[in-house]
Structure formats: C-alpha cells, structure tokens
Amino acid sequence: MGDYVLRCLTGGEVLEDHYTLACPHHPGFVRAEYTAKQLTVRENLPGVFRFSDWLPVRGSVPTRSRPVTFQNRELCRELGQPNLWITFTGYYPERGCYVPTGSFKELEALPTIVRLNEAGGGTLVVASAGNTGRAFAQMSAEFGTPVVLVVPESSADKLWTAGYFDHSSIRLVTVRGDYTDAIKTADKICEAPGFFPEGGGKNIARRDGMGCVMLDGAVTIGKLPEYYFQAVGSGTGGIAAWEAAIRLIGDGRFGSKFPELHLSQNLPFVPMVRAWNAGRDHIIDEDMPDAQASISAVSAHVLTNRTPPYGICGGVYDAMKSCGGQMYTVENKDAASAASLFAEAENGIDIDPAAAVAFASLISAAEEGSIRTNADILLNITGGGYQRVKKDCETAKIGVYETVDTGEVPVL
C-alpha cells in the first residue's frame, strides 16, 4: 500500500524519503509518484486509509474520519445545477460523516502522523489558525504522538478534543500575533533537535490526504467533475485537488480533462485573488493592503495566510494554470447567507466559515452563469457539524502551555 517515489518538481530528481519536505538542491514542491497507477478503494481499511494506494504511508491507525460525497436535491434545484455534488468532511452522522473535530484537516493529520512514525518518530510542530491545530491535537490525544501547537492568541478557544481527554502529549503555545506570526514561531521551535515541522503545503501526506476529497468525489460520481469549488487560505487544498486529478487522469477510468479550479477567499483579505486576477505568478505587498486590519475583519480566519505557496513550483499558480478556472472574493454577509441556506437544506448542520465562503462563491457563479448548467460540480465543504459534535460527544479544551511574542521561543 502507498508504494511511491518522491520527486523534486523543479529538478526532476528522485529523493529519498525520510519525512522529506523539500529538495535539498532546488526550491519548489516535492511530489509522491505512486506505484499503483489505478486506484483501488480498500473498503477493509479505516476511514481515509481506504485511499491508501495514493497516500504516502505503509500502515494506518483506527479512524472513521473520511470525506463523504452526496447530493442534495433541494440545493440542486435552488442553484439550478442538477449535477451538484457535495463532499463533506465533518461531523454529520445522518450522512455517515464522523470526523470528531469537524474539519477536513483530519484528512491531513492522519497520514502525517503515520508518515512521521514510519520515518522514526519525533515531536511534530504545527502552526495553525485553529482547524489544523485541533485536528493534530485530536490525533495526539488518540494515538499519543507528541505535538506542539502554535496558534495566534485569539485562536486558543478553537483548540479542543472530542472523546479523548489525555492532553499530556500536547503543548499549546499561543502567539501575540496572527497566523503568519505563529508560523514564524513554529519555525524557530523546529531549530531544536527532535522537533519536526509538519510542513504545511510542502508535506506530501497533508496534500495527498486533502486530495482524498477529489478521490472520493470522482469515485462517487464515476468521473472527474468539470468544476471544483473550495475556499483557500494557503491554497494547499487547491493544489491537492489538482494533484489528485493528475492521478485520476492517469488511472484512465475517470476522464482525461482536469476539473476547473474555482477557489475563493474572504474579503477583505484576498491576496491570491488579486495576484491571479492581475496575471501574476507572485504576491506583492499591494495584494495585502493593511493586512492586519483585513485579517481581523474576515469571518473565516483560517483563510488568512500571508505567505501561501502561490508562486512556488507546484504551487497554486501552477495548479490554476494547469486546470483553468477562477478565483472569487466573498463578503462576510454572503458567506453567512450561504451557511444559512446549507443549514436549511441539511438538517440544521452548521458548516465551517471557510466552507460557507466556498458555497457562497458557487452560488455567485451559478447566478452569474459562469459555470455550465448540467455540468458535474464538486463543492468541498471543508468542515461542519461543530454543534452536533458538542451535543453528541464530550469535548475538552486544551490548556495553554505558554504565551509568547512573535519570534520568541517557548521553553519546551
């Protein structure tokens, strides 16, 4: 399962994988090339590991966390799109979704901890605006993998676990600053021996874990969708969708055309949208005017990465150029309306603010006629069901280990 080689996208050379995040000789992403050219969905394996053929792991851990793809006829009628498919990764038992932290970030955390343990283990250092940190905290509480979570001070209340309450392997460090400041602090922690960065977009386990959304969608629909909608902060989910599509096209059973990527950001913080619409392969300061105030004003704080892998080889720009598509800006009020519409159609389920941004962009595209009626559309609902989790499961907040200023290194 998951046999692969690791290839540098810039230089083309094959690298040894020792939880390798980057090529030592070239900038740009590395990518897993799997021995299995056709995907076998392994129903006997738990959760997301059913897609182990295309995950960079040999084994698995017990889990029910996986994406689930379905249709809602009411939403299809509302949008005038009869072939709208929703891939939901969250907590929604009526739809067979049992992700305890409510976020698709568990699709990244699960293969990452298995990959690290198979490479010899260590302490993972995770910078997060909330959802990623919660996913890795859940994995740490369940499986004992030591983690250091580094989050903005304002995100501390988003860090909790469901059903598992031993937090002895978790150190939560809060930073007086934003998500990018948390990343800088995490990088400094990783300079000490025994501490390993989870890697963000550079981590093939994270990207290929997220790519399982596209895999589940294509397997359920029976082919690749024409359009793929997701909200992005780092843009790694869009990259993951592109890479999964490359593999599905290579499989030969799901079509030969890339899905268009329709990616969205939350106004007023929309640096990638500005760069893409200007035709640039890089982000400039003018794409983030008054960044701190803009970050404070969004409803989806997980979408506020100031240093996304946009122009890097294998990054967001390359994904968009390969697949085609559009980028959207979404106002808070439109995201809130989209969330209400989803809840009305789906048993009151609350979707993540980022997922609401994605859904709002789809509503806008349908209203403006920028997507073809009757086309197969895949909407990535990246999280939801938080109220149900807290109703059905006991949850425990993670205590803060230390609060630091930007760039300050905590004593661990």
Swiss-Prot record:
Domain of life according to the entry: Archaea
InterPro entries assigned to the protein according to its UniProt record, in alphabetical order: Cysteate_synthase, TrpB-like_PALP, TrpB-like_PALP_sf
Single GO molecular function: magnesium ion binding
N6-(pyridoxal phosphate)lysine: modified positions: 105
Keyword Transferase part of the UniProt annotation: yes
Keyword set, alphabetical order: Coenzyme M biosynthesis, Pyridoxal phosphate, Transferase
HAMAP family (alphabetical): Cya_synthase
Chain's role: Specifically catalyzes the beta-elimination of phosphate from L-phosphoserine and the beta-addition of sulfite to the dehydroalanine intermediate to produce L-cysteate.
Family of this protein: Belongs to the threonine synthase family. Cysteate synthase subfamily.
Name of the featured protein: Cysteate synthase
Organism the protein comes from: Methanocorpusculum labreanum (strain ATCC 43576 / DSM 4855 / Z)
